[in-house]
């Protein structure tokens, strides 16, 4: 199963630059989860952000402040902030269909990242992009509310 997960990780932009060896090393730490439709995988504001998710099958709604802001599916991922900081979840993610995901706990990712600084750098760039998008979204909401 590790080789299947490793191949899947290489399809995720965040991990696309991994060597085959790195992908196999990281894949060992991912666990497969099956999630029924209707289950919330994360809840906005909760401090339980200890896992990063990669969706293999199914779709989920992304909900921010009670409003559905997007839909994610196979190849998409979420929970990046949990990989670098124990922080509140920024969105609720709810399964719209039955899902199969691969998850990694932040402490396992950190062990891997310590030995692979290029992965840490790419994650930092990705999280910075997410934060900039969130800042722009909040600015639009603020302008609309004025």
Regions found by a protein language model. Give the residues of each.
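Ligand-binding loop in jelly-roll beta-barrel domains
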Residues: 86-107
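Structural motif
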Residues: 13-16, 30, 76, 88, ...
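Short beta-strand His + acidic residue motifs that chelate non-heme Fe in jelly-roll/DSBH
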Residues: 62, 80-81, 91-95, 111
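Short acidic-glycine-tyrosine-enriched beta hairpin
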Residues: 67-80
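ATP/adenylate-binding site constellation spanning eukaryotic-like Ser/Thr protein kinases
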Residues: 57, 74-77, 98, 106, ...
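Regulatory nucleotide-sensing modules
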Residues: 5-6, 10-65, 72
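A small-molecule sensor/coupling module
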Residues: 5, 22-25, 89-90, 107-146
């Amino acid at each position: 199963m590790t080789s299947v997960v490793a191949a899947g990780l290489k399809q995720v932009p965040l991990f696309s630059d991994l060597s085959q060896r790195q992908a196999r090393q990281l894949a060992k730490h991912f666990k497969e989860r099956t999630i029924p439709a209707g289950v919330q995988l994360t809840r906005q504001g909760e401090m339980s952000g200890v896992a990063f998710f990669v969706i293999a099958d199914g779709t989920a709604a992304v909900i921010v402040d009670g409003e559905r802001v997007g839909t994610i599916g196979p190849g998409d991922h979420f929970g990046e902030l949990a990989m670098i900081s124990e922080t509140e979840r920024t969105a609720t993610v709810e399964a719209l269909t039955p899902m199969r995901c691969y998850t990694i706990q932040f402490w396992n990712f950190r062990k891997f990242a310590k030995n692979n600084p290029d992965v840490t750098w790419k994650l930092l760039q990705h999280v910075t992009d997410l934060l900039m998008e969130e800042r722009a979204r909040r600015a639009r909401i603020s302008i609309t509310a004025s």
